Swiss-Prot record:
Pfam family of the protein (one): Ribosomal_S15
Protein localization: Plastid, Chloroplast
Protein name as annotated: Small ribosomal subunit protein uS15c
GO cellular component, one term: ribosome
Record family assignment: Belongs to the universal ribosomal protein uS15 family.
Keywords for the protein's UniProt record, in alphabetical order: Chloroplast, Plastid, Ribonucleoprotein, Ribosomal protein
Listed HAMAP family: Ribosomal_uS15_B
SMART domains reported for this sequence: Ribosomal_S15
Record GO terms (molecular function): structural constituent of ribosome
Gene Ontology biological-process entries: translation
Annotated organism of origin: Coffea arabica
Amino acid sequence: MVKNTLISVISEEEKRGSVEFQVFRFTNKIRRLTSHLELHKKDYLSQRGLRKILGKRQRLLAYLAKKNRVRYKELIGLLSIRETKTR
């Protein structure tokens, strides 16, 4: 499973403040909230929280893409995230 391999890599490095780890945690929260919202369609507070987390992850991914394009490509490949649109 992708999640376990990424956790083992990040745990070995013990860099919990790294951009990759933060994006990984936000992605897990997003997936958990998405499955919650499929059951509870009118939970507007959770929808707001999901939008906030999506924005935070998008900003972190933009930062990573600007600083290190190779690490960005690897991360979106591992987490199965679509590449962000450029304006």
